[in-house]
């Protein structure tokens, strides 16, 4: 249904219930520290580290959680995989007050993941799987216009990791 006619057709008041819909990169980050980044990893080498911390990252999680903590009504719109990482993202975002109704499970794409290698000074290097968000297209957004119509604004990032959207940018 066209959101421009939703109010007239349904008698609904199109009050903006969501302050911001966060779209795009939605990631599970695995923080590995300390890693001596100045030394090549090399084959067969064991690096002893602190316990690996698993958290969320990407613009959807980072900005979404920050906005929710500022008492904004926010929602996530992205693809996740059909895997355990998707469950972790959904739980973390839900626990932080981010609406996850529009986190879409992609049938073939994996949830985006990153190994974040951190040295003693805080410098970071990344090993990243873009995963399902790279499969987002203009249709992914157009098919959810009713959801976006409930929002005051949207924030999309990172375009370079979503190549199927680049051709649709002005």
Regions found by a protein language model. Name each.
Residues 2-31, 91-105, 117-170:
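Ribokinase/PfkB-type carbohydrate-kinase core domain
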């Amino acid at each position: 249904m066209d959101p421009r006619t939703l109010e007239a057709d349904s008698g609904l008041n199109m009050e903006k219930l969501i302050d911001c819909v966060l779209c795009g990169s939605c990631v599970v980050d695995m923080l590995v520290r300390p890693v001596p980044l100045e030394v090549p990893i090399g084959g067969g080498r064991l690096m002893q580290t602190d316990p690996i911390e698993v958290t969320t990252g990407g613009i959807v999680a980072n900005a979404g959680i920050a906005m929710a903590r500022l008492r904004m009504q926010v929602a996530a719109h992205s693809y996740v995989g059909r895997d355990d990482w998707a469950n972790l993202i959904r739980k973390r975002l839900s626990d932080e007050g981010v609406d996850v109704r529009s986190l879409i499970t992609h049938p073939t794409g994996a949830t985006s993941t990153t190994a974040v290698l951190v040295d003693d000074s805080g410098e970071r290097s990344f090993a990243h799987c873009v995963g399902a968000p790279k499969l987002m297209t203009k249709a992914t957004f157009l098919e959810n216009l009713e959801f976006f119509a409930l929002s005051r604004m949207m924030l999309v990032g990172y375009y370079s990791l979503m190549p199927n959207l680049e051709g649709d940018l002005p």
